[in-house]
């Protein structure tokens, strides 16, 4: 272990580590406490690792309290003795792995043993290069603060002086009011905030009800959410003429956070993070900054462990599914000819049901033993 720590200190040049881009996530291989594992990289998680509790990393040494968009919960931890990403050795001092019961491969629809958080890269000048699917660990001598951005394709940002082990950056509503949104590669959506935050900055009228409400899944459970059309926001210094945000229909759980900017926005940029100097560099390589509304049938479905089948958990009122008579509790047998007979992740189910606005999807259902076949349009379930 001492030799690994010495090597971590000695590494001073540029080190590149490839990662895999899943549909809405970064998957990276790492050796943790001698185990070869794969992780979803999540800058929104302030710790080091969250690992499936069925994987042995050593004796449990403590507990950690975790927070997501919905609430808080406690999990057991294991002290880390070694961490390595490719040829990059990470000093594991004071790092812990949270041991949590979860099937991450099931969640991310690719082999995944857990989550790698911001703490792993925090002490480095780290580039998340989406363009070439790799991390670039730059030498400490690289000072992005000396760069001059053009504020069209390149942007230099100062981290806000709030939060712990988090990258809080400035976001402005169309009326200029500030939102505190963390840079969060683990959020699969474009931008996620809360209903009370929209009310505070004047983007939603208090006590008014959204027309289209769906259900989203986070670590602490299911939560009502909906999509809001936003025109003229400025996200991390970038002018965004039109975008669609996911809104959690619960109050924000922290005065220091209004939500996060997620994968849907970040995937358009190469990002350099220098936490010690409190600076972030963005390079827009795709030419895109906004997102398109998701085409939805109005069905929320997921695998039911007790019934051993995919079942409908919610039908959005006034949606194509509601108009077709689909009901909560119906079993989903196949989507566009793909059988759903085995265990399948909710992200994969959603990817089959949803798609571009204006396209169609054919779904086979069963209800009380009776088979039904329906062709549904995918529509934009957007709240103006």
Locate predicted features.
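Pepsin/retropepsin-fold aspartyl endopeptidases
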Residues: 8-384
């Amino acid at each position: 272990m001492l030799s690994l720590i010495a090597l971590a200190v000695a590494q001073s040049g540029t080190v590149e580590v490839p990662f895999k881009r899943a549909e809405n996530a970064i998957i990276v291989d790492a050796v943790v406490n001698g185990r070869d594992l794969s992780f979803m990289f999540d800058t929104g998680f302030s710790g080091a690792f969250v690992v499936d509790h069925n994987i042995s990393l050593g004796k449990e040494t403590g507990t950690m309290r975790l927070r997501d968009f919905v609430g808080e919960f406690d999990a057991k931890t294991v002290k880390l003795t070694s961490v390595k990403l490719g040829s990059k050795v990470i000093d594991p001092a004071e790092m812990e792995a949270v041991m949590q019961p979860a099937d991450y491969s099931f969640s991310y629809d690719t082999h995944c043993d857990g989550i790698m958080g911001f703490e792993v890269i925090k002490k480095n000048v780290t580039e998340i290069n989406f363009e070439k699917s790799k991390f670039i660990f730059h030498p400490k001598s690289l000072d992005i603060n000396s760069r001059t951005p053009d504020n069209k394709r390149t942007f230099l940002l100062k981290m806000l002086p709030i939060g712990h082990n988090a990258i809080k950056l400035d976001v402005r509503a169309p009326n200029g009011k500030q939102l505190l949104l963390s840079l969060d590669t683990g959020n699969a959506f474009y931008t996620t905030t809360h209903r009370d935050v929209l009310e505070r900055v004047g983007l939603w009228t208090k006590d008014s009800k959204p027309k289209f409400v769906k259900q989203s899944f986070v670590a602490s459970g299911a939560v009502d959410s909906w999509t809001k059309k936003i025109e003229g926001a400025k996200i991390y210094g970038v002018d965004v003429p039109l975008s669609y945000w996911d809104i959690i229909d619960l109050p924000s759980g922290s005065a220091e956070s209004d939500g996060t900017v997620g994968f849907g926005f970040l995937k358009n940029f190469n990002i350099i993070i220098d936490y010690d100097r409190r600076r972030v560099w963005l390079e827009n390589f795709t030419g895109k900054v906004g997102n398109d509304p998701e085409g939805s049938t109005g069905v929320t479905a997921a695998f039911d462990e007790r019934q051993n089948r995919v079942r409908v958990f919610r039908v959005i009122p006034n949606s194509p599914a509601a108009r077709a008579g689909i009901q909560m509790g119906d079993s989903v047998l196949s989507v566009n000819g793909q059988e759903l007979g085995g265990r399948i992740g909710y992200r994969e189910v959603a990817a089959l049901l949803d798609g571009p606005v204006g396209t169609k999807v054919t779904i086979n259902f069963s209800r009380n033993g009776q088979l039904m076949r329906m062709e549904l349009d995918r529509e934009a379930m957007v709240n103006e």
